[in-house]
């Protein structure tokens, strides 16, 4: 079953797996809210943060001019995909960006790969050093920090 991002609120159904195989496609179309964004099954989205531009008044020594994200990316979502352990080819093992509109919904149909590994030898998304993103956060200088439990980073 694909992962998804859906609006939450009155009348939404968050019952998987209790409704699995008990409802047909038509029932689902008539009684549920479609996700606004889908993600590959087994990609394991663990951490999500929304970029909140910081116009920090710190000195240039603290925040160099060439390292942070621009204000134009304010509100974008960044999601850490921990990655699959049980599928071939592997999926996940990356950080994606989801541009968000003023209404709080994604402005794209699919998340945009932001930090990922593309291996030409056939091992897929896995990083050779074991890197597996867990969470993402921005520092006061608008730089994205990524944690990994595969490398201790």
Write out the residue ranges for each language-model feature.
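Blade-level signature of beta-propeller repeat domains, shared across WD40, Kelch, NHL, RCC1
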Residues: 137-153
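Beta-propeller domain segments
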Residues: 1-127, 131, 141, 153
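Short glycine-rich, acidic/polar surface loops and turns
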Residues: 133-135
